[in-house]
Every structure is written in structure tokens, then in C-alpha cells.
């Protein structure tokens, strides 16, 4: 078997009792691969483990968890300075795994782990909000954000991505559009938005394709706005067809500015960020990620 450089797996604490994962790691270790494992307990652990990975000289830091875990590891990696910054590997263990699914990471743990260690490392973009918070997948605002933020953890654990839809239907009568103004390169829109998706990746909320044209290495963010005065009629309309749909506004830009007369909340890879003013910009080729050769999000 070919020799591979060492890797460090940063595992979300919720996945420590995953027996198939433990078996997959032990099997690869028996085949000669060096895999260090660290478990997160609280916010900030991922950044500390990335620093440890640099000292160990590993070639890959593997994010084992959902979109939030991937986000924490990515954010720590892009803050590293100097040469020999480890590549990102992805092991999908979360509720929705939107980013991992959209880039084609295998669901089988052993295959995903092998890809994370031995896959080709490709430079991909990230995005940054207000010069501080980053996301690798998507920023969502409006109806979708409130649903994903408020869906109970027990419901998510039991039903996965379907839980967001069920909780959304339960809350349909209490949700209202967000009034805002959005500017970008050759783009300007203002009005009432039911859902706002600004994507480096394509899907969020457990498999919803909010930005179906997004690519992760094109230096652009894809914007999709779902409009309408009432939630249910507009939602039904958007589900029918994307072609010539008056309730869908689209744009592409390396940056977007969003202003609102009231506080709105964006969900950045699962983490909420509230405010009235947002500047979202792309960070081209911000890190290297081990991806399958047929990844659909590469140009």
C-alpha cells in the first residue's frame, strides 16, 4: 500500500460513540496510516487542534461533524500563516451535512475517510461576513434561517433534514418576510424577502438547493432571493418551477452588501449572526480541500 502523510481528525464531541467510525480508523491504522484523533468539547477547541496539527506536521486536518464543525476547522485553517498549511478533509457526521453532500463526499465512513486522507487537494473559496465571521457553504436569511435556528435538537436528531420542513410547516402562520436592500457588482434589489441564500456552496437546511449554480472555486458568490407577500403561496410557487418564476431573484458577485431597517438574522453554516448591515465577500482560493475527482461544485 502507498504511504500517506499523517492526518489529524477533529471530531465533534457528539460523535464519540460512533462505533463504525472507530472501526474505520482502526482499520486504516492497521494498513499503515497515521491518524491522530482529537475531540471537541467547546467552542475554540477546533482552532487549538489546528495549531496542534501544524506542530505535528500533518498533511490534512479532517473535520468530523456537520457544517458547523467544518466551518470551525476551515476558519482556523485560513487564519494559519506560513508554508505547509494542512489541507481540509471532510468526514460528514452531522444532521444535514449540506456542504459534504453537495461536493460529493461519500456517505460511507470508510470511503469518506480514505478520501479525506488521500484525495486530491484543490484550492477552494470561502466567504467572510463583516471582515470577521466566515462560511464555507452558505449564508441564509429570512424564513429558512428562523426555521433552521429554531428547530428542536431532538427533532433534528430523530428526523434529520426532514425536521426543518416539518418545523417550518408548524410555524408557517407566524413567519413574515424581511424588508431589506441588497447591492453587489451590477446588482441592486430592495423589497420583502422570504428567503435569502448567498452561496459559496449550493444547498442548506437539509438538502434545499438554494443556490443551484454555485461553484466553490470561481471567485463568486451566488445570490437567490425568494420574494412574496405571503409565505405559503410564495413557497408553493417557488416549489413548482425555477424558470421565469417572479418570486425568485438571482445574482452573482464577489461581494454583497445587505441593509435592513430592522434586525435580521443570517445563518452561516449553522451559526446565527444578527444585525442590520452585512458585507459579505468571497475569499478566493482560501484553503485546499480534498475532494472527489467528479466534484460537481468545481468549474
Curated annotation (Swiss-Prot):
Binds 1 Mg(2+) ion per subunit. Ca(2+) may be able to substitute. Pfam families: DAGK_cat, YegS_C. Keywords: ATP-binding, Cytoplasm, Kinase, Lipid biosynthesis, Lipid metabolism, Magnesium, Metal-binding, Nucleotide-binding, Phospholipid biosynthesis, Phospholipid metabolism, Transferase. NCBIfam families: lip_kinase_YegS, PRK13054.1, YegS/Rv2252/BmrU family lipid kinase. Gene3D superfamilies: 2.60.200.40, Probable inorganic polyphosphate/atp-NAD kinase, domain 1. This is Probable lipid kinase YegS. One of its GO terms (biological process) is phospholipid biosynthetic process. One of its GO terms (molecular function) is magnesium ion binding. The gene is yegS. ATP binds at residues 40, 66-72, 95. It comes from Shigella flexneri. PANTHER family: LIPID KINASE YEGS, SPHINGOSINE KINASE.
Amino acid at each position: 500500500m502507498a504511504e500517506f502523510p499523517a492526518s489529524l481528525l477533529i471530531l465533534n464531541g457528539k460523535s464519540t460513540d460512533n462505533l463504525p467510525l472507530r472501526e474505520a480508523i482502526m482499520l486504516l491504522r492497521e494498513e499503515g496510516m497515521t491518524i491522530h484523533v482529537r475531540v471537541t468539547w467547546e467552542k475554540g477547541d477546533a482552532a487549538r487542534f489546528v495549531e496542534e496539527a501544524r506542530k505535528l506536521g500533518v498533511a490534512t486536518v479532517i473535520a468530523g461533524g456537520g457544517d458547523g464543525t467544518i466551518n470551525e476547522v476551515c476558519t482556523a485553517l485560513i487564519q494559519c500563516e506560513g508554508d505547509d498549511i494542512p489541507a481540509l478533509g471532510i468526514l460528514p457526521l452531522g444532521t444535514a451535512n449540506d456542504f459534504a453532500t453537495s461536493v460529493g463526499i461519500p456517505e460511507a465512513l470508510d470511503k469518506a475517510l480514505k478520501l479525506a486522507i488521500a484525495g486530491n487537494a484543490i484550492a477552494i473559496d470561502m466567504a467572510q461576513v463583516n471582515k470577521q465571521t466566515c462560511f464555507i457553504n452558505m449564508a441564509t436569511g429570512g424564513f429558512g434561517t428562523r426555521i433552521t435556528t429554531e428547530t428542536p435538537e431532538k427533532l433534528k436528531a430523530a428526523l434529520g433534514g426532514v425536521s426543518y420542513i416539518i418545523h417550518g410547516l408548524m410555524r408557517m402562520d407566524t413567519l413574515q418576510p424581511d424588508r431589506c436592500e441588497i447591492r453587489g457588482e451590477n446588482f441592486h434589489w430592495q423589497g420583502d424577502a422570504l428567503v435569502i441564500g448567498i452561496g459559496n456552496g449550493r444547498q442548506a437546511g437539509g438538502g434545499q438547493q438554494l443556490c443551484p449554480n454555485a461553484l466553490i472555486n470561481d471567485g463568486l458568490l451566488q445570490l437567490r432571493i425568494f420574494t412574496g407577500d405571503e409565505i405559503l403561496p410564495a413557497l408553493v410557487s417557488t416549489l413548482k418551477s425555477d424558470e421565469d418564476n417572479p418570486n425568485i431573484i438571482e445574482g452573482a458577485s464577489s461581494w454583497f452588501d445587505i441593509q435592513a431597517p430592522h434586525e435580521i438574522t443570517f445563518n452561516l453554516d449553522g451559526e446565527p449572526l444578527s444585525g442590520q448591515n452585512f458585507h459579505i465577500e468571497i475569499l478566493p482560493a482560501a484553503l485546499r480541500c480534498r475532494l472527489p475527482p467528479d466534484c460537481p461544485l468545481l468549474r
